[in-house]
């Protein structure tokens, strides 16, 4: 189960929505050159403005262009290419509030394969664009990223 804990603000702009920043924690590093090349490999992804790795803390920090098509899964998969385990991610994302087929609140992010489920007692305005920052605690493949607002 993926759990995202987020603070959010509603903004007046629309027109684009995507992940803006990702800090992904990893563990199980068996290949020092793999970790050292992680930032370089990340920079090859179109839409990445900067990438840095703190090997001692096991954190890859990725800053994305304002308008990009980068998905959280892309960064997770890049880290896991060499057997390293992606553990959690702190993300900053902008998206549009919607409802899924069951009526649950979700955050739609264009080009993002997985919607974010908004888990909160808060009532949302359909179609509102929100900025959120939160934590994905479980990065296993799943049909839905879970988003719990504080």
Label the predicted regions.
Residues 18-36, 147:
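Short N-terminal segments immediately surrounding and downstream of signal-peptide cleavage
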Residues 139-150:
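OB-fold/S1-family single-stranded nucleic acid-binding modules
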Residues 7-17:
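Hydrophobic h-region of N-terminal signal peptides that target proteins for export
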Residues 38-54, 59-62:
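Short acidic amphipathic segments
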Residues 99-117:
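OB-fold (S1/OB) nucleic-acid-binding surfaces
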Residues 121-133:
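Short nucleic-acid-contacting surface segments enriched for D/E, G, S/T with interspersed K/R
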Residues 38-41, 72-82:
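Short amphipathic alpha-helices in soluble, non-transmembrane regions
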Residues 88-102, 132-134:
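Structural detector for short beta-strands of small beta-barrel domains
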């Amino acid at each position: 189960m993926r759990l995202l804990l987020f603070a959010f603000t509603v903004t007046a702009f629309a027109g684009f929505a995507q992940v803006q920043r990702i800090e992904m924690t990893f563990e199980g590093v068996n290949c020092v050159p793999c970790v050292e090349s992680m930032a370089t490999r990340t920079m090859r992804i179109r839409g990445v403005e900067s990438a840095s790795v703190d090997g001692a803390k096991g954190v890859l920090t990725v800053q994305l262009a304002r308008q990009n098509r980068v998905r959280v899964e892309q960064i997770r998969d890049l880290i896991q290419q060499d057997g390293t385990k992606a553990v959690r991610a702190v993300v900053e994302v902008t998206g549009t509030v919607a409802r899924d087929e069951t009526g649950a609140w979700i955050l739609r992010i264009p080009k993002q394969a997985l919607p974010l489920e908004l888990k909160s007692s808060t009532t949302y305005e359909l179609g509102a664009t929100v900025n959120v920052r939160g934590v994905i605690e479980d990065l296993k493949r799943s049909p839905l990223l879970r988003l719990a607002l504080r």
